[in-house]
Amino acid sequence: MSRGYADRNVRRYQAYTGIGHQAALQQMKDKAPGSRPISTAQGAQRQLEGLVFEHLKGDVAYFAHPLGIASVLPGPGASTVTLDDSMTRHGHPLVAHAIEGLLPAEVPESVRTEGSEHIGVSGIRVARLSRRALHLTLVGTSASVVLRSAGDTDWAALVGERHSDLSGAGYRPCWNEPTLAEQEREFRTDHADYWRATEDASWLPSGLLRRVGLLHEVSSAYCTRYWATWDDWKFELNHDQDVLPAHDALVEHLIDPKWGMELRVDKRHCQCDAVWVDPHYDRECRIELAGPQGRPGTLQLRFRSLGTWRDSSSTHADLLRVQADHRWLHRVMPRHQSPSLSKARGRRRGRPDRSAAQ
């Protein structure tokens, strides 16, 4: 393999996963000849990754990376997900928000309503816990998702605080139980169709999680949100004024036969070049993707472009506050970039000021 080809593969691995150059270089060196660059999770591993991704949503807030995920290191039997060291819009640490959404606990009788009820994700368990990482698994399996933080997060302390808070309020944390708790079993029985549908379609969120870096490295959206209804996933990608959605590039990466997923474009509606669109108002392009015929799971991508009636300066300030990368900000929100700052950076890098040359 030529040096140039190997370097391109390393850069591409970085774009898909968001990990650093040295880590990407090592991952590509360790790949067996002929294997897929990004391995596909199977069985319980795939299901765990799907559940984690579905419930990791970092609230409606702005983070240094889309969805608050800085990087993912995917492996055949385990994945490591690094979260941003950021706060939600309520001033709550993102890592604490993730713990609350993922770790299950039984609800006390005093606050239960009709039907099965518990908080967190049924069946998720803590396999190992340290100051630096939270190792998750599914009950009765060897599946593994390791959560880390880009900051100095004490995972053990946060999980301990969560356990104390819940216990003090009458809840029963069950993330250390070797089997399903009663309320978890009730939930799976009462919602068997839903549980089966999400499990059958878990290939989709698992594959997206393993390629989450594309939302930062390829997409031109400054904000990305998502939600799932059974096996139907929807992503909303918001773009600033005068920034063209990179929907073609993003989809090409997602369906790439070597690096992407088993997805195909099912429907496409684009308003980028529509002459009748009033720039004062928002516009939206939609692309729907599906898996092989008969395979459950659909993905709808909504690329929203803001109209001139919106002022995104406060959003830009929020992204600066959470320490979003300045080069990324310049790409996704260029109109908020300070001209003097751009010139200074160009001089520091030894590049001429292009605006002066024009």
Task: Locate each region found by the language model.
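Compositionally biased accessory segments in Actinobacterial proteins
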Residues: 4-12, 16-358
